[in-house]
Protein backbone atom coordinates (compact mmCIF):
# COMPACT_ATOMS: atom_id res chain seq x y z
CA UNK A 1 0.00 0.00 0.00
CA UNK A 2 2.89 2.39 0.79
CA UNK A 3 4.40 1.64 -2.65
CA UNK A 4 1.07 2.38 -4.32
CA UNK A 5 0.73 5.61 -2.35
CA UNK A 6 4.24 6.68 -3.41
CA UNK A 7 3.31 6.38 -7.09
CA UNK A 8 0.25 8.60 -6.74
CA UNK A 9 2.05 11.13 -4.53
CA UNK A 10 4.85 11.86 -7.00
CA UNK A 11 5.45 15.52 -7.90
CA UNK A 12 7.42 17.09 -10.76
CA UNK A 13 9.62 20.08 -11.34
CA UNK A 14 9.10 22.31 -14.37
CA UNK A 15 11.82 21.91 -16.99
CA UNK A 16 14.35 24.72 -17.22
CA UNK A 17 13.57 25.18 -20.90
CA UNK A 18 10.13 26.47 -20.05
CA UNK A 19 8.49 23.94 -22.30
CA UNK A 20 5.36 22.21 -21.08
CA UNK A 21 6.16 18.96 -19.31
CA UNK A 22 4.20 16.56 -17.22
CA UNK A 23 4.78 13.79 -14.74
CA UNK A 24 4.44 10.73 -16.94
CA UNK A 25 4.56 8.29 -14.04
CA UNK A 26 1.73 10.02 -12.20
CA UNK A 27 -0.42 10.78 -15.26
CA UNK A 28 -0.18 7.31 -16.78
CA UNK A 29 -0.76 5.68 -13.37
CA UNK A 30 -4.01 7.48 -12.61
CA UNK A 31 -5.25 7.07 -16.19
CA UNK A 32 -4.49 3.34 -16.20
CA UNK A 33 -6.30 2.90 -12.90
CA UNK A 34 -9.36 4.69 -14.27
CA UNK A 35 -9.10 2.60 -17.44
CA UNK A 36 -9.41 -0.58 -15.37
CA UNK A 37 -13.11 0.20 -15.47
CA UNK A 38 -12.83 -0.43 -19.20
CA UNK A 39 -11.04 -3.74 -18.59
CA UNK A 40 -13.90 -4.99 -16.45
CA UNK A 41 -16.45 -3.53 -18.85
CA UNK A 42 -14.89 -5.54 -21.70
CA UNK A 43 -14.60 -8.77 -19.71
CA UNK A 44 -18.10 -8.64 -18.30
CA UNK A 45 -19.59 -7.73 -21.67
CA UNK A 46 -18.08 -10.65 -23.59
CA UNK A 47 -17.64 -13.46 -21.05
CA UNK A 48 -21.31 -14.39 -21.31
CA UNK A 49 -20.82 -15.44 -24.94
CA UNK A 50 -18.55 -18.35 -23.97
CA UNK A 51 -20.64 -19.32 -20.96
CA UNK A 52 -23.89 -19.18 -22.95
CA UNK A 53 -24.02 -22.79 -24.28
CA UNK A 54 -23.44 -24.17 -20.78
CA UNK A 55 -25.57 -21.99 -18.47
CA UNK A 56 -28.50 -22.33 -20.90
CA UNK A 57 -28.42 -26.10 -20.40
CA UNK A 58 -27.87 -25.74 -16.65
CA UNK A 59 -30.88 -23.44 -16.19
CA UNK A 60 -33.01 -25.38 -18.70
CA UNK A 61 -33.55 -22.49 -21.11
CA UNK A 62 -31.87 -24.00 -24.19
CA UNK A 63 -35.28 -24.35 -25.88
CA UNK A 64 -36.62 -20.97 -24.79
CA UNK A 65 -35.56 -18.10 -27.09
CA UNK A 66 -37.31 -15.62 -24.81
CA UNK A 67 -35.30 -16.62 -21.75
CA UNK A 68 -32.11 -16.84 -23.81
CA UNK A 69 -32.64 -13.30 -25.06
CA UNK A 70 -33.41 -12.09 -21.54
CA UNK A 71 -30.19 -13.61 -20.19
CA UNK A 72 -28.19 -11.90 -22.96
CA UNK A 73 -29.90 -8.51 -22.77
CA UNK A 74 -30.69 -7.96 -19.08
CA UNK A 75 -27.22 -6.48 -18.56
CA UNK A 76 -28.10 -3.85 -21.17
CA UNK A 77 -30.98 -2.67 -19.02
CA UNK A 78 -28.52 -2.27 -16.17
CA UNK A 79 -26.21 -0.35 -18.52
CA UNK A 80 -28.96 2.16 -19.29
CA UNK A 81 -29.64 2.80 -15.61
CA UNK A 82 -25.96 2.90 -14.70
CA UNK A 83 -25.15 5.36 -17.49
CA UNK A 84 -27.84 7.89 -16.57
CA UNK A 85 -27.41 7.69 -12.81
CA UNK A 86 -23.62 7.92 -13.12
CA UNK A 87 -23.67 11.13 -15.13
CA UNK A 88 -25.93 12.98 -12.74
CA UNK A 89 -24.12 11.71 -9.65
CA UNK A 90 -20.69 12.40 -11.17
CA UNK A 91 -21.50 16.08 -11.68
CA UNK A 92 -22.83 16.33 -8.14
CA UNK A 93 -20.47 14.12 -6.11
CA UNK A 94 -17.39 13.84 -8.32
CA UNK A 95 -15.82 11.33 -10.67
CA UNK A 96 -13.77 9.33 -8.16
CA UNK A 97 -16.67 8.13 -5.94
CA UNK A 98 -18.47 6.74 -9.00
CA UNK A 99 -15.35 4.88 -10.12
CA UNK A 100 -15.16 3.30 -6.66
CA UNK A 101 -18.83 2.35 -6.81
CA UNK A 102 -18.40 0.75 -10.23
CA UNK A 103 -15.43 -1.27 -8.95
CA UNK A 104 -17.48 -2.56 -6.02
CA UNK A 105 -20.38 -3.44 -8.33
CA UNK A 106 -18.08 -5.36 -10.68
CA UNK A 107 -16.66 -7.34 -7.75
CA UNK A 108 -20.10 -8.16 -6.36
CA UNK A 109 -21.55 -9.07 -9.75
CA UNK A 110 -18.61 -11.32 -10.69
CA UNK A 111 -19.08 -13.39 -7.56
CA UNK A 112 -22.88 -13.45 -7.60
CA UNK A 113 -23.29 -14.39 -11.27
CA UNK A 114 -21.23 -17.53 -10.83
CA UNK A 115 -22.58 -18.39 -7.39
CA UNK A 116 -26.33 -18.45 -8.00
CA UNK A 117 -28.12 -21.63 -9.07
CA UNK A 118 -31.54 -20.03 -9.58
CA UNK A 119 -32.12 -18.36 -12.94
CA UNK A 120 -33.92 -15.30 -11.54
CA UNK A 121 -30.97 -14.56 -9.24
CA UNK A 122 -28.57 -15.13 -12.13
CA UNK A 123 -30.50 -12.46 -14.06
CA UNK A 124 -30.33 -10.10 -11.07
CA UNK A 125 -26.56 -10.52 -10.89
CA UNK A 126 -26.22 -9.84 -14.64
CA UNK A 127 -28.39 -6.74 -14.23
CA UNK A 128 -26.11 -5.55 -11.43
CA UNK A 129 -23.08 -6.11 -13.63
CA UNK A 130 -24.77 -4.05 -16.33
CA UNK A 131 -25.05 -1.12 -13.91
CA UNK A 132 -21.29 -1.38 -13.35
CA UNK A 133 -20.70 -1.37 -17.11
CA UNK A 134 -22.98 1.65 -17.55
CA UNK A 135 -21.07 3.61 -14.91
CA UNK A 136 -17.58 2.66 -16.07
CA UNK A 137 -18.26 3.09 -19.80
CA UNK A 138 -18.86 6.81 -19.39
CA UNK A 139 -16.88 7.69 -16.28
CA UNK A 140 -13.53 6.14 -17.17
CA UNK A 141 -12.94 8.06 -20.44
CA UNK A 142 -14.38 11.24 -18.94
CA UNK A 143 -12.02 11.12 -15.96
CA UNK A 144 -9.03 10.45 -18.23
CA UNK A 145 -9.93 13.36 -20.53
CA UNK A 146 -10.15 15.71 -17.54
CA UNK A 147 -6.75 14.82 -16.07
CA UNK A 148 -4.75 14.27 -19.28
CA UNK A 149 -2.53 17.01 -20.80
CA UNK A 150 -3.86 18.21 -24.16
CA UNK A 151 -0.91 16.88 -26.19
CA UNK A 152 -1.54 13.27 -25.13
CA UNK A 153 -5.25 13.38 -24.27
CA UNK A 154 -6.34 11.35 -27.30
CA UNK A 155 -3.70 8.73 -26.64
CA UNK A 156 -4.65 8.40 -22.97
CA UNK A 157 -8.40 8.25 -23.57
CA UNK A 158 -7.66 5.57 -26.17
CA UNK A 159 -6.03 3.59 -23.35
CA UNK A 160 -9.54 3.10 -22.01
CA UNK A 161 -10.51 1.34 -25.24
CA UNK A 162 -7.28 -0.68 -25.05
CA UNK A 163 -8.25 -1.96 -21.61
CA UNK A 164 -11.76 -2.72 -22.92
CA UNK A 165 -10.36 -4.90 -25.69
CA UNK A 166 -7.87 -6.48 -23.28
CA UNK A 167 -10.85 -7.33 -21.09
CA UNK A 168 -12.62 -8.77 -24.13
CA UNK A 169 -9.55 -10.83 -25.03
CA UNK A 170 -9.17 -11.92 -21.41
CA UNK A 171 -12.76 -13.17 -21.38
CA UNK A 172 -12.28 -14.97 -24.69
CA UNK A 173 -9.08 -16.67 -23.49
CA UNK A 174 -10.67 -17.54 -20.14
CA UNK A 175 -13.65 -19.10 -21.89
CA UNK A 176 -11.38 -21.08 -24.21
CA UNK A 177 -9.11 -22.32 -21.39
CA UNK A 178 -11.84 -23.06 -18.86
CA UNK A 179 -14.13 -24.96 -21.22
CA UNK A 180 -13.08 -28.60 -21.40
CA UNK A 181 -13.08 -30.29 -24.84
CA UNK A 182 -16.54 -31.50 -25.84
CA UNK A 183 -16.64 -34.98 -27.41
CA UNK A 184 -18.47 -35.07 -30.72
CA UNK A 185 -20.98 -37.66 -29.47
CA UNK A 186 -22.03 -35.66 -26.38
CA UNK A 187 -25.74 -34.94 -26.11
CA UNK A 188 -27.07 -31.76 -24.48
CA UNK A 189 -27.74 -33.83 -21.34
CA UNK A 190 -24.12 -35.00 -21.32
CA UNK A 191 -22.85 -31.43 -21.66
CA UNK A 192 -25.14 -30.27 -18.85
CA UNK A 193 -23.84 -33.02 -16.55
CA UNK A 194 -20.20 -32.33 -17.44
CA UNK A 195 -17.81 -29.99 -15.65
CA UNK A 196 -18.55 -27.32 -18.27
CA UNK A 197 -22.27 -27.46 -17.55
CA UNK A 198 -21.94 -27.55 -13.75
CA UNK A 199 -18.88 -25.45 -12.86
CA UNK A 200 -17.08 -24.24 -15.99
CA UNK A 201 -19.47 -21.41 -16.79
CA UNK A 202 -19.29 -20.24 -13.15
CA UNK A 203 -15.50 -19.89 -13.29
CA UNK A 204 -15.82 -17.88 -16.49
CA UNK A 205 -17.77 -15.24 -14.55
CA UNK A 206 -15.60 -15.51 -11.43
CA UNK A 207 -12.58 -14.63 -13.57
CA UNK A 208 -13.49 -10.94 -13.22
CA UNK A 209 -13.33 -10.94 -9.42
CA UNK A 210 -9.55 -10.49 -9.06
CA UNK A 211 -9.16 -7.50 -11.43
CA UNK A 212 -12.28 -5.96 -9.86
CA UNK A 213 -10.66 -6.19 -6.41
CA UNK A 214 -7.45 -4.63 -7.76
CA UNK A 215 -9.45 -1.82 -9.37
CA UNK A 216 -11.29 -1.16 -6.11
CA UNK A 217 -8.00 -0.97 -4.18
CA UNK A 218 -6.12 1.25 -6.64
CA UNK A 219 -9.05 3.62 -7.22
CA UNK A 220 -8.79 4.62 -3.56
CA UNK A 221 -5.48 6.34 -4.32
CA UNK A 222 -6.29 8.36 -7.45
CA UNK A 223 -7.13 12.08 -7.08
CA UNK A 224 -10.44 13.67 -7.94
CA UNK A 225 -10.73 15.30 -11.37
CA UNK A 226 -9.18 18.79 -11.17
CA UNK A 227 -11.78 20.20 -13.56
CA UNK A 228 -14.62 18.94 -11.38
CA UNK A 229 -12.89 20.38 -8.31
CA UNK A 230 -12.50 23.77 -10.03
CA UNK A 231 -16.12 23.69 -11.18
CA UNK A 232 -17.19 23.17 -7.56
CA UNK A 233 -15.02 26.05 -6.30
CA UNK A 234 -12.41 23.82 -4.63
CA UNK A 235 -9.52 25.89 -5.96
CA UNK A 236 -6.72 24.63 -3.71
CA UNK A 237 -7.48 20.97 -4.34
CA UNK A 238 -7.78 21.55 -8.08
CA UNK A 239 -4.46 23.43 -8.14
CA UNK A 240 -2.81 20.65 -6.15
CA UNK A 241 -3.85 17.98 -8.66
CA UNK A 242 -2.88 20.09 -11.69
CA UNK A 243 0.54 20.87 -10.21
CA UNK A 244 1.14 17.17 -9.58
CA UNK A 245 0.28 16.51 -13.21
CA UNK A 246 2.47 19.20 -14.80
CA UNK A 247 4.08 21.51 -12.26
CA UNK A 248 3.15 25.02 -11.17
CA UNK A 249 3.35 26.66 -14.60
CA UNK A 250 1.11 23.99 -16.13
CA UNK A 251 -1.32 24.31 -13.21
CA UNK A 252 -1.50 28.10 -13.67
CA UNK A 253 -2.21 27.85 -17.41
CA UNK A 254 -4.81 25.09 -17.07
CA UNK A 255 -6.48 26.73 -14.09
CA UNK A 256 -6.86 30.04 -15.95
CA UNK A 257 -8.54 28.31 -18.90
CA UNK A 258 -10.88 26.36 -16.63
CA UNK A 259 -11.88 29.51 -14.73
CA UNK A 260 -12.45 31.48 -17.96
CA UNK A 261 -14.99 28.95 -19.22
CA UNK A 262 -16.58 28.57 -15.77
CA UNK A 263 -16.84 32.23 -14.83
CA UNK A 264 -20.33 33.72 -14.60
CA UNK A 265 -22.00 30.68 -16.08
CA UNK A 266 -24.89 28.69 -14.70
CA UNK A 267 -24.71 25.28 -13.15
CA UNK A 268 -24.88 22.34 -15.50
CA UNK A 269 -27.69 19.86 -15.82
CA UNK A 270 -30.12 18.39 -18.32
CA UNK A 271 -31.90 21.73 -18.77
CA UNK A 272 -28.66 23.46 -19.75
CA UNK A 273 -27.55 20.53 -21.90
CA UNK A 274 -30.77 20.66 -23.95
CA UNK A 275 -30.70 24.46 -24.30
CA UNK A 276 -30.12 25.99 -27.75
CA UNK A 277 -26.32 26.57 -27.56
CA UNK A 278 -25.69 22.92 -26.69
CA UNK A 279 -28.15 21.18 -29.03
CA UNK A 280 -25.84 20.88 -32.02
CA UNK A 281 -22.99 19.30 -30.07
CA UNK A 282 -25.43 17.06 -28.17
CA UNK A 283 -26.90 15.74 -31.44
CA UNK A 284 -23.36 15.18 -32.72
CA UNK A 285 -22.43 13.24 -29.58
CA UNK A 286 -25.56 11.08 -29.67
CA UNK A 287 -25.08 10.19 -33.35
CA UNK A 288 -21.40 9.34 -32.80
CA UNK A 289 -22.33 7.15 -29.81
CA UNK A 290 -25.17 5.30 -31.53
CA UNK A 291 -23.17 4.81 -34.72
CA UNK A 292 -20.42 3.05 -32.76
CA UNK A 293 -23.01 0.35 -32.06
CA UNK A 294 -25.07 0.44 -35.26
CA UNK A 295 -21.96 0.00 -37.41
CA UNK A 296 -22.53 -3.66 -36.51
CA UNK A 297 -19.14 -4.82 -35.27
CA UNK A 298 -20.30 -5.59 -31.75
CA UNK A 299 -22.69 -8.29 -32.98
CA UNK A 300 -19.58 -10.23 -33.96
CA UNK A 301 -18.62 -10.35 -30.28
CA UNK A 302 -22.14 -11.02 -28.98
CA UNK A 303 -23.05 -13.59 -31.63
CA UNK A 304 -19.61 -14.86 -32.66
CA UNK A 305 -20.68 -18.46 -32.04
CA UNK A 306 -23.58 -18.20 -34.50
CA UNK A 307 -21.57 -16.24 -37.08
CA UNK A 308 -18.69 -18.73 -37.19
CA UNK A 309 -20.97 -21.77 -37.08
CA UNK A 310 -22.89 -20.40 -40.06
CA UNK A 311 -19.49 -20.22 -41.82
CA UNK A 312 -19.01 -23.96 -41.27
CA UNK A 313 -17.03 -24.22 -38.00
CA UNK A 314 -17.65 -26.62 -35.08
CA UNK A 315 -18.17 -25.36 -31.52
CA UNK A 316 -14.59 -26.24 -30.53
CA UNK A 317 -13.15 -24.35 -33.50
CA UNK A 318 -15.47 -21.43 -32.84
CA UNK A 319 -13.97 -20.76 -29.39
CA UNK A 320 -10.47 -20.63 -30.89
CA UNK A 321 -11.61 -18.36 -33.75
CA UNK A 322 -13.16 -16.02 -31.19
CA UNK A 323 -9.77 -15.73 -29.46
CA UNK A 324 -8.22 -14.85 -32.85
CA UNK A 325 -10.69 -11.98 -33.22
CA UNK A 326 -9.80 -10.80 -29.72
CA UNK A 327 -6.07 -10.74 -30.54
CA UNK A 328 -6.77 -8.69 -33.67
CA UNK A 329 -8.89 -6.34 -31.57
CA UNK A 330 -6.00 -5.68 -29.18
CA UNK A 331 -3.33 -5.30 -31.87
CA UNK A 332 -5.27 -2.74 -33.88
CA UNK A 333 -6.29 -0.77 -30.79
CA UNK A 334 -2.56 -0.14 -30.37
CA UNK A 335 -2.63 1.23 -33.92
CA UNK A 336 -5.34 3.69 -32.83
CA UNK A 337 -3.30 4.79 -29.82
CA UNK A 338 -0.30 5.41 -32.08
CA UNK A 339 -2.23 7.31 -34.76
CA UNK A 340 -4.88 9.28 -32.85
CA UNK A 341 -2.56 12.26 -32.22
CA UNK A 342 -0.97 11.97 -35.68
CA UNK A 343 -3.90 11.46 -38.05
CA UNK A 344 -6.54 13.04 -35.83
CA UNK A 345 -9.98 11.91 -34.69
CA UNK A 346 -11.92 12.87 -37.83
CA UNK A 347 -9.67 10.98 -40.26
CA UNK A 348 -9.85 7.79 -38.18
CA UNK A 349 -13.64 7.97 -37.89
CA UNK A 350 -13.92 8.37 -41.67
CA UNK A 351 -11.51 5.48 -42.17
CA UNK A 352 -13.55 3.26 -39.87
CA UNK A 353 -16.93 4.03 -41.40
CA UNK A 354 -15.70 3.73 -44.98
CA UNK A 355 -13.63 0.63 -44.33
CA UNK A 356 -16.46 -1.23 -42.58
CA UNK A 357 -18.90 -0.31 -45.37
CA UNK A 358 -16.64 -2.07 -47.86
CA UNK A 359 -15.86 -5.08 -45.66
CA UNK A 360 -19.52 -5.71 -44.82
CA UNK A 361 -20.44 -5.47 -48.48
CA UNK A 362 -17.93 -8.22 -49.29
CA UNK A 363 -18.90 -10.27 -46.21
CA UNK A 364 -22.58 -10.16 -47.11
CA UNK A 365 -21.80 -11.15 -50.68
CA UNK A 366 -19.77 -14.14 -49.44
CA UNK A 367 -22.70 -15.27 -47.29
CA UNK A 368 -24.99 -14.85 -50.32
CA UNK A 369 -22.80 -17.17 -52.40
CA UNK A 370 -22.36 -19.54 -49.38
CA UNK A 371 -18.61 -19.08 -49.10
CA UNK A 372 -17.30 -20.80 -45.95
CA UNK A 373 -14.07 -21.55 -44.15
CA UNK A 374 -10.90 -19.54 -43.59
CA UNK A 375 -11.74 -16.63 -45.91
CA UNK A 376 -14.78 -15.79 -43.78
CA UNK A 377 -12.60 -15.67 -40.66
CA UNK A 378 -10.26 -13.28 -42.50
CA UNK A 379 -13.15 -10.94 -43.34
CA UNK A 380 -14.41 -10.98 -39.75
CA UNK A 381 -10.90 -10.23 -38.45
CA UNK A 382 -10.56 -7.38 -40.97
CA UNK A 383 -13.85 -5.89 -39.76
CA UNK A 384 -12.71 -6.07 -36.14
CA UNK A 385 -9.30 -4.62 -37.03
CA UNK A 386 -10.92 -1.70 -38.86
CA UNK A 387 -13.26 -1.04 -35.93
CA UNK A 388 -10.50 -1.37 -33.32
CA UNK A 389 -8.27 1.25 -34.93
CA UNK A 390 -11.06 3.76 -35.46
CA UNK A 391 -14.67 3.72 -34.27
CA UNK A 392 -14.04 1.66 -31.13
CA UNK A 393 -11.58 3.94 -29.31
CA UNK A 394 -12.10 7.26 -31.12
CA UNK A 395 -15.80 7.42 -30.22
CA UNK A 396 -14.89 7.56 -26.54
CA UNK A 397 -12.18 10.16 -27.22
CA UNK A 398 -14.66 12.42 -29.00
CA UNK A 399 -17.41 12.03 -26.41
CA UNK A 400 -14.98 12.90 -23.63
CA UNK A 401 -13.71 15.99 -25.50
CA UNK A 402 -16.62 17.80 -27.14
CA UNK A 403 -18.68 18.78 -24.07
CA UNK A 404 -17.95 21.68 -21.66
CA UNK A 405 -16.81 20.99 -18.12
CA UNK A 406 -20.05 22.07 -16.48
CA UNK A 407 -22.23 19.60 -18.43
CA UNK A 408 -19.69 16.89 -19.23
CA UNK A 409 -21.03 14.43 -16.68
CA UNK A 410 -24.67 14.63 -17.72
CA UNK A 411 -23.70 14.90 -21.41
CA UNK A 412 -21.55 11.77 -21.24
CA UNK A 413 -24.40 10.06 -19.42
CA UNK A 414 -26.88 11.05 -22.13
CA UNK A 415 -24.60 9.90 -24.95
CA UNK A 416 -23.69 6.69 -23.12
CA UNK A 417 -27.39 6.06 -22.52
CA UNK A 418 -27.98 6.52 -26.27
CA UNK A 419 -25.06 4.20 -26.99
CA UNK A 420 -26.53 1.43 -24.85
CA UNK A 421 -29.99 1.94 -26.40
CA UNK A 422 -28.25 1.51 -29.74
CA UNK A 423 -26.48 -1.58 -28.43
CA UNK A 424 -29.75 -3.07 -27.17
CA UNK A 425 -31.40 -2.38 -30.53
CA UNK A 426 -28.48 -3.95 -32.38
CA UNK A 427 -28.36 -7.02 -30.14
CA UNK A 428 -32.13 -7.50 -30.22
CA UNK A 429 -32.55 -7.03 -33.98
CA UNK A 430 -29.58 -9.10 -35.20
CA UNK A 431 -31.26 -12.53 -34.80
CA UNK A 432 -34.50 -11.11 -36.24
CA UNK A 433 -32.69 -9.67 -39.27
CA UNK A 434 -30.65 -12.84 -39.63
CA UNK A 435 -33.85 -14.92 -39.75
CA UNK A 436 -35.76 -12.59 -42.06
CA UNK A 437 -32.98 -11.52 -44.44
CA UNK A 438 -30.23 -14.08 -43.92
CA UNK A 439 -26.66 -13.27 -42.92
CA UNK A 440 -25.99 -11.62 -46.28
CA UNK A 441 -28.92 -9.21 -46.02
CA UNK A 442 -28.02 -8.32 -42.44
CA UNK A 443 -24.45 -7.37 -43.27
CA UNK A 444 -25.59 -5.43 -46.35
CA UNK A 445 -27.78 -3.36 -44.03
CA UNK A 446 -24.79 -2.70 -41.76
CA UNK A 447 -22.82 -1.67 -44.85
CA UNK A 448 -25.50 0.88 -45.76
CA UNK A 449 -25.48 2.26 -42.20
CA UNK A 450 -21.70 2.69 -42.42
CA UNK A 451 -22.07 4.61 -45.69
CA UNK A 452 -24.47 6.97 -43.92
CA UNK A 453 -21.99 7.34 -41.05
CA UNK A 454 -19.17 8.16 -43.45
CA UNK A 455 -21.21 10.90 -45.14
CA UNK A 456 -22.31 12.35 -41.79
CA UNK A 457 -18.76 12.48 -40.42
CA UNK A 458 -17.52 14.02 -43.66
CA UNK A 459 -20.03 16.84 -43.29
CA UNK A 460 -20.47 17.41 -39.56
CA UNK A 461 -17.55 16.03 -37.51
CA UNK A 462 -14.96 18.63 -36.40
CA UNK A 463 -11.32 17.85 -35.65
CA UNK A 464 -10.49 18.04 -31.93
CA UNK A 465 -6.81 17.05 -32.05
CA UNK A 466 -4.40 19.38 -30.25
CA UNK A 467 -7.06 21.61 -28.67
CA UNK A 468 -7.64 22.04 -24.94
CA UNK A 469 -11.06 21.15 -23.56
CA UNK A 470 -11.70 24.83 -22.89
CA UNK A 471 -10.73 25.83 -26.46
CA UNK A 472 -13.10 23.18 -27.80
CA UNK A 473 -15.89 24.65 -25.70
CA UNK A 474 -15.33 28.07 -27.27
CA UNK A 475 -15.29 26.53 -30.77
CA UNK A 476 -18.31 24.24 -30.42
CA UNK A 477 -20.70 26.08 -28.07
CA UNK A 478 -22.00 29.21 -29.78
Regions found by a protein language model. Give the residues of each.
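Alpha-helical transmembrane bundle of multi-pass membrane proteins
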Residues: 7-8, 15-235, 241-243, 263-478
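Short phosphate-engaging motifs
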Residues: 237, 250
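Extended, hydrophobic alpha-helical segments
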Residues: 242-246, 258-259
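Short, well-structured alpha-helical segments
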Residues: 251-260
